[in-house]
């Protein structure tokens, strides 16, 4: 279920207990092990290992269990979701934050901002409707329940949040559920019918009685576990009874339902509230009903609606097929819902106050995904996420410390059959397959075809469509020679002829791939010479190839060659290569084949096609063919080997959402490397970016439509105001209810960010207000208002101007002593550059001099670079994750690159945009990927770089300089620095170590000295040098 049903066994850390309670209670298992059989315990442990897998850091499994999302929200895998904004919100003097949240992992969703009050601190900080909160004060909200998220958001008066700007908020349209129960009497599992719950159908059945339990504060242990809660649409059930405990002595049995405790009704109470009631009293009066069953897990299927556009006040979805999620968990609810006044099939489900909770650390999440063929007529992408099944956890009603005087064995331990049923009741993980691989059945079918095929078909190449198998792995069947080297053979013209083997770098060992390749060539030539001598002594007819067999072999290999050629070449080049190969097969002439091929295959990655064309060459022409292409292949292979880098397209899976399925294909870049990209390429992302820009201009309709009779099993999904939340403390009174809300028009379940252009004054008025505000508060801010302007190519989820960086995208810096300004790598022309100053904004008490040093001012300049050079030849540093240098700057320019030859770029320039794509307020890795992708795109020539030339900065005062000596910059505040080239930096390019031992460590940038007579301070630590890094392609 969404959160477990009991308080002692929390295998996945999904409960609402504090971390201390979970750590102390997690050692008590759900099923006893003293009297259970060894086979049963082994099976349980094996099932648990298969379910959880090895721990992979502090990530909790989703309480949704197995989730299948169809037509998922745009947060799944979009460019906009990669843009992380830093927002800092402080409570107002009245103690309000001014925003509401929606979602939660119990619904298979993240935490979304659904409402932002006008004039609140959240609105001033730049928080927008549709933002997905991923982190708060260093705590991740990925796979977090709503109760836990609200507890984190209300635990501090100052929130530093990392959000992803999605521009939309989820809402549930339809839901149905199915619960699996453990029948204690008949020792079997019972699956309820859709729409009926055993607790509802048997509400009047069973014997009810009142049980009094007396404990002491020193030895508090009730001796039973509970499951259920209103967040799951279930009551509170007893799932385990300790052998010889207090509950067993008073007649409480497994399968009993707790109807009330100390006057608090349990028919509409959350799991954590029930735990508080049961654990907080020394005298507990329980109302018990015998049901003979308790819930094991629950399946839920939900459908979510997503707004596309607004026409005539009616909300429209992206497509008729809405998002649906199916989860093996317990996240249903039987809470009452308000019905709308407008006839429609949608409703904004309201969620009551969720209880706070926390998750146990150290449990991994198993996510698999597959992509179906996208619909040509729609814009909705389909993805599937499968998460491990979660059996509802138990909460043990006992004290945290051990009690050696009592046995806490389970009553179920006396019945291994029940334990075995529970272990086998977990739904098997679905069988998934990636479309880049072949199943075992397909491999067997291919082997049968190879055995039963013609000799020409037996020689056909078997190729995997992944990058590593395409380039390094051996795709042909090989055998081990006497010296242990692998050789590939193909059957052609009735005789065995050696073909070009796949190079396996992993098995090369101490011998380099180039040396192995050359050795193989020499040994093969020697063996070919001996084979020719022996063939001359034989019959003349054996030397002549059969034309029919050669044509048949060409026809069998033609689809494979064309498939690879289409990935490496243009359409015209593919036709030319096919035409030349066909002419050679029918007419002969190896020179007429090689010369045009070498002209067409003019790049290292294109020369990979020669490996497959070699299989078409007749055995008598192989020697001539190899002598003509051997040197070119060696050079190409060495170039590819030196440029092998990790493809940036293979991003690590994020924790919030499972990966979206793509049909991938290896695509070569201009440097000879390969990247695994979607079959549709980048146009799909561009279309999505245009769609998001259009959606950003939409506004929310005040009139929404909602169904009159919503489905009973729909889990609530309401806007939870974080300001109205107060931790619930239950004694002997019923849980407090929410205050009544005045009737108002229901808002739609999908909320978009409203455009603020009509509400915003002109830029000059904004600047004047910001200056007056900064004077009234007697503090300066760190960024100018230039962030309101965007480059033409920047993709933004909404047209809202970028708020002040100090409150939204910036970070508050702790008050530090002043640092001397960095030396400017400019010549005499730098003094002539006019600095464009905006209203300075900073969260610290500083002087104008400090603001000038922190505020990078300068003139915007457009620089064009040619992409004809092999490498761009620059390295960059900084990024939004850096507290010292949030902007991206050029760190070093390497000789021989395109940047060096242009002469217009210098170290220290700030990169603002590249080929129309904005580089402001982006992470370091995103800036690296953007620059690399722009330089690889040879279709856009030349490359346009918008840089900010730094202006002259005031010299620091002696007091400031001396103050800097006392307080150094911590090492963890160094900006992310990653040069963007693949070639190592020679030693003579590195700076000399500084001689002044009192120079503080800074961001380790390499700048050219200025012509000023004063010596420039060294920008690195005395005992370290900046590590050389590869250049940009």
From Swiss-Prot:
One of its GO terms (biological process) is auditory receptor cell stereocilium organization. The keyword Secreted does not apply. Residues 86-168, 210-293, 862-934 form the PDZ domain. Residues 323-380, 444-464, 754-864, 943-1033 are annotated as: Disordered. Keywords: Cell projection, Chromosomal rearrangement, Cilium, Deafness, Disease variant, Non-syndromic deafness, Nucleus, Repeat, Retinitis pigmentosa, Usher syndrome. It holds the Pfam family PDZ. The keyword DNA-binding does not apply. One of its GO terms (molecular function) is identical protein binding. It is found in: Cell projection, Cilium; Nucleus; Cell projection, Stereocilium. InterPro entries: PDZ, PDZ_sf, PDZD7_HN-like, USH2_Complex_Protein. One of its GO terms (cellular component) is stereocilium. SUPFAM superfamilies: PDZ domain-like. Residues 991-1000 have a biased composition (Pro residues). Residues 323-344, 785-797 have a biased composition (Low complexity). Residues 770-784 have a biased composition (Basic residues). Weakly expressed in the inner ear. Expressed in the retinal pigment epithelium. In cochlear developing hair cells, essential in organizing the USH2 complex at stereocilia ankle links. Blocks inhibition of adenylate cyclase activity mediated by ADGRV1. It is linked to Deafness, autosomal recessive, 57: A form of non-syndromic, sensorineural deafness characterized by symmetric, bilateral hearing loss with onset in early childhood. Vestibular function is preserved. Sensorineural deafness results from damage to the neural receptors of the inner ear, the nerve pathways to the brain, or the area of the brain that receives sound information. DFNB57 severity ranges from moderate to severe. A chromosomal aberration disrupting PDZD7 has been found in patients with non-syndromic sensorineural deafness. Translocation t(10;11),t(10;11). Homodimerizes (via PDZ2 domain). Component of USH2 complex, composed of ADGRV1, PDZD7, USH2A and WHRN. Interacts (via PDZ domains) with WHRN; the interaction is direct. Interacts with USH1G. Interacts with ADGRV1 (via the cytoplasmic region). Interacts with USH2A (via the cytoplasmic region). Interacts with MYO7A (via MyTH4-FERM domains). This is PDZ domain-containing protein 7. It comes from Homo sapiens. The gene is PDZD7.
């Amino acid at each position: 279920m969404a959160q477990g049903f009991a308080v002692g066994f929390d295998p996945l850390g999904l409960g609402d207990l504090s971390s201390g309670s979970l750590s102390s209670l997690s050692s008590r298992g759900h099923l006893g092990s003293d009297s259970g059989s060894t086979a049963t315990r082994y099976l349980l442990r094996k099932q648990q290992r298969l379910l959880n897998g090895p721990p992979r850091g502090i990530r909790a499994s989703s309480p949704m269990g197995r989730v299948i999302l169809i037509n998922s929200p745009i947060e799944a895998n979009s460019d906009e979701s990669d843009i992380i904004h830093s927002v800092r919100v402080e409570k107002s003097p009245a103690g309000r934050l001014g925003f509401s949240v929606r979602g939660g992992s119990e619904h298979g969703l993240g935490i979304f901002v659904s409402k932002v009050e006008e004039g609140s601190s959240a609105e001033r900080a730049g928080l927008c409707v549709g933002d997905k909160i991923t982190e708060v004060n260093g705590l991740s909200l990925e796979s977090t329940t709503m109760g836990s998220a609200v507890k984190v958001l209300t635990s501090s008066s100052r929130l530093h949040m990392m959000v992803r700007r999605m521009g939309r908020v989820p809402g549930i349209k339809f839901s149905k559920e199915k619960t699996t129960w453990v029948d204690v009497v008949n020792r079997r599992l019972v699956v309820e019918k859709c729409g009926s719950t055993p607790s509802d159908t048997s509400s009047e059945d069973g014997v009810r009685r009142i049980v009094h339990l007396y404990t002491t504060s020193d030895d508090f242990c009730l001796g039973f576990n509970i499951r259920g809660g209103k967040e799951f649409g279930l009551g509170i059930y007893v799932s385990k009874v300790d052998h010889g405990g207090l509950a067993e002595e008073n007649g409480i049995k497994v399968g009993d339902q707790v109807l009330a405790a100390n006057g608090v009704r349990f028919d509409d109470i959350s799991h954590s509230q029930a735990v508080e009631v049961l654990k907080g009293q020394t005298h507990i009066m329980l109302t018990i009903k015998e049901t003979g069953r308790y819930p094991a897990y629950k399946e839920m299927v939900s459908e979510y609606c997503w707004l596309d556009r607004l026409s005539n006040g009616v909300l429209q979805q992206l497509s008729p097929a809405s998002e649906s999620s199916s989860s093996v968990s317990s996240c249903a609810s039987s809470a009452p819902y308000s019905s709308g006044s407008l006839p429609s099939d949608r409703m904004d489900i309201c969620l009551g106050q969720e209880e706070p909770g926390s998750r146990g650390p150290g449990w991994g999440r198993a996510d698999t995904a597959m992509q179906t063929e996208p619909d040509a007529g729609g814009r909705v992408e389909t993805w599937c996420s499968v998460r491990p099944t979660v059996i509802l956890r138990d909460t043990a009603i006992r004290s945290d410390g051990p009690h050696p005087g009592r046995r806490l064995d389970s009553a179920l331990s006396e019945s291994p059959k029940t334990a075995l049923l529970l272990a086998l009741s977990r739904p098997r993980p679905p069988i998934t397959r990636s479309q880049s691989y072949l199943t075992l059945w397909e491999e067997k079918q291919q082997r049968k075809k190879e055995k039963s095929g013609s000799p020409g078909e037996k020689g056909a190449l078997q190729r995997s469509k992944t990058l590593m198998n395409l380039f390094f792995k051996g795709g042909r069947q090989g055998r081990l020679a006497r010296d242990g080297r692998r050789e590939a053979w193909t059957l052609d013209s009735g005789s065995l002829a050696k073909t070009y083997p796949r190079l396996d770098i992993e098995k090369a060992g101490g011998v380099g791939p180039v040396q192995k390749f050359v050795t193989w060539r020499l040994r093969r030539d020697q063996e070919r010479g001996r084979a020719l001598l022996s063939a001359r002594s034989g019959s003349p007819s054996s030397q002549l190839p059969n034309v029919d067999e050669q044509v048949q072999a060409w026809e069998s290999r033609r689809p494979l060659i064309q498939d690879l050629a289409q990935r490496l070449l243009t359409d015209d080049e593919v036709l030319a290569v096919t035409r030349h190969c066909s002419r050679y097969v029918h007419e002969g002439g190896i020179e007429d084949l090689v010369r045009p091929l070498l002209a067409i295959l003019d790049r290292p990655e294109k020369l990979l096609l020669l490996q497959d064309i070699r299989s078409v060459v007749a055995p008598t022409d192989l020697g001539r063919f190899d002598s003509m292409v051997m040197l070119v292949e060696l050079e190409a292979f060495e170039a590819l080997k030196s440029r092998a880098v990790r493809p940036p397209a293979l991003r690590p899976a994020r924790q919030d959402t499972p990966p979206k399925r793509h049909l991938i294909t290896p695509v070569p870049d201009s440097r000879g490397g390969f990247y695994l990209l979607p079959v549709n390429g980048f146009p799909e992302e561009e279309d999505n970016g245009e769609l998001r820009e259009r959606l950003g201009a939409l506004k929310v309709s005040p009139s929404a439509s909602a169904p009159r009779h919503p489905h009973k099993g729909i889990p609530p999904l309401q806007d939870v105001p974080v300001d109205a939340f107060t931790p619930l403390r239950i004694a002997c009174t019923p849980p407090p209810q929410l205050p009544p809300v005045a009737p108002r028009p229901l808002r739609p379940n999908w909320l978009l960010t409203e455009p603020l252009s009509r509400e915003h004054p002109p830029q000059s008025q904004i600047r004047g207000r910001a200056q007056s505000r900064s004077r009234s508060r007697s503090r300066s801010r760190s960024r100018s208002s230039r962030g309101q302007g965007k480059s033409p190519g920047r993709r933004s989820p909404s047209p809202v101007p970028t708020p002040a960086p100090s409150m939204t995208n910036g970070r508050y810096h702790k008050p530090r002593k002043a640092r001397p300004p960095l030396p400017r790598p400019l010549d005499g022309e730098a003094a002539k550059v006019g600095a464009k100053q905006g209203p300075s904004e900073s969260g610290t008490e500083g002087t104008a001099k400090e603001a000038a040093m922190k505020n990078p001012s300068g003139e915007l300049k457009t620089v064009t670079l040619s992409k004809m050079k092999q490498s761009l030849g620059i390295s960059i540093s900084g990024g939004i994750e850096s507290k010292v240098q949030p902007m991206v700057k050029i760190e070093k320019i390497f000789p021989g690159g395109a940047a060096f030859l242009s002469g217009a770029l210098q170290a220290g320039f700030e990169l603002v945009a590249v080929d129309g794509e904005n580089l402001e307020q982006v992470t370091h890795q995103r800036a690296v990927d953007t620059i690399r992708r722009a330089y690889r795109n040879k279709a856009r020539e030349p490359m346009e770089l918008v840089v900010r030339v730094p202006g002259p900065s005031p010299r620091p005062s002696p007091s400031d300089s001396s103050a800097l000596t006392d307080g150094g910059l911590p090492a963890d505040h160094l900006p992310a620095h990653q040069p963007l080239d693949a070639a190592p930096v020679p030693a003579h390019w590195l700076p000399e170590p500084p001689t002044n031992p009192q120079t503080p460590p800074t961001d380790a940038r390499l700048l050219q000295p200025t012509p000023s007579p004063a010596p420039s301070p060294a920008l690195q630590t005395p005992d370290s040098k900046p590590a050389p890094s590869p250049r940009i392609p």
